[in-house]
């Protein structure tokens, strides 16, 4: 799995979670059970943590990133579509995030 330590922070992967061989997961990232990170997706937990809930999938080419003081939480049973950029936000359980969506810090999607 393409998991990268940043400082003292190493991604944590839940049971049966899957990360595509060319995805990038770096730093303070926690993947829930049965989560999946698809081709060319990037999750950068470099400023604050990223939490991906159980049974959630981050589809191809999406980028998830945090700002200092603005962590990211993606709920359970969420589909983040292809080429989505999420930046320091919260996505509620079961929420779909459409293709090519852009969300800036502190926004909440429910």
Name what the model sees in each region.
Residues 100-106:
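Conserved small/polar residues in nucleotide/adenosyl-binding loops
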Residues 10, 106-107:
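Low-complexity, intrinsically disordered short peptide segments enriched in small/polar/basic residues
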Residues 96-98:
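Acidic, proline/serine/threonine- and glycine-rich low-complexity intrinsically disordered segments
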Residues 1-94:
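Domain-scale signature associated with acetyltransferase and cell-envelope carbohydrate enzymes
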């Amino acid at each position: 799995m393409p998991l990268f330590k940043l400082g003292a922070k190493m991604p944590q992967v839940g049971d049966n979670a899957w990360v595509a061989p060319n995805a990038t997961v770096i730093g303070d990232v926690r993947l829930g059970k049965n989560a999946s990170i698809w081709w060319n997706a990037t999750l950068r937990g470099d400023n604050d943590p990223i939490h991906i809930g159980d049974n959630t999938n981050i589809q191809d080419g999406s980028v998830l990133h945090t700002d200092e003081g603005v962590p990211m939480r993606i709920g359970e049973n969420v589909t983040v579509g292809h080429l989505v950029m999420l930046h320091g936000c919260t996505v509620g359980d079961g929420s779909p995030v459409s293709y090519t969506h852009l969300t800036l810090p502190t926004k909440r999607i429910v």
